[in-house]
Curated annotation (Swiss-Prot):
The lineage of its organism: Eukaryota, Metazoa, Chordata, Craniata, Vertebrata. GO terms for biological process: chromosome condensation; sperm DNA condensation. GO terms for cellular component: nucleosome; nucleus. Belongs to the protamine P1 family. This is Sperm protamine P1. It comes from the Eukaryota. Disulfide bonds: none annotated. It is found in: Nucleus; Chromosome. One of its GO terms (molecular function) is DNA binding. Testis. Keywords: Chromosome, Developmental protein, Differentiation, DNA condensation, DNA-binding, Nucleosome core, Nucleus, Spermatogenesis.
Length: 47
């Protein structure tokens, strides 16, 4: 059970992503506004 899973673009109830995020980057679970490479990815960037 990874708590850093990214939600779908429609379920992105996370606050704005970090500033060090690329363009099409969605916010992961409200886990300290973590950014993911793709809103469909399961790995989050710990930046």
């Amino acid at each position: 059970m990874a708590r850093n899973r990214c939600r779908s673009p429609s379920q992105s109830r996370c606050r704005r992503p970090r500033r060090r995020c690329r363009r099409r980057i969605r916010c992961c679970r409200r886990q300290r506004r973590v950014c993911c490479r793709r809103y469909t990815t399961t790995r989050c960037a710990r930046q």
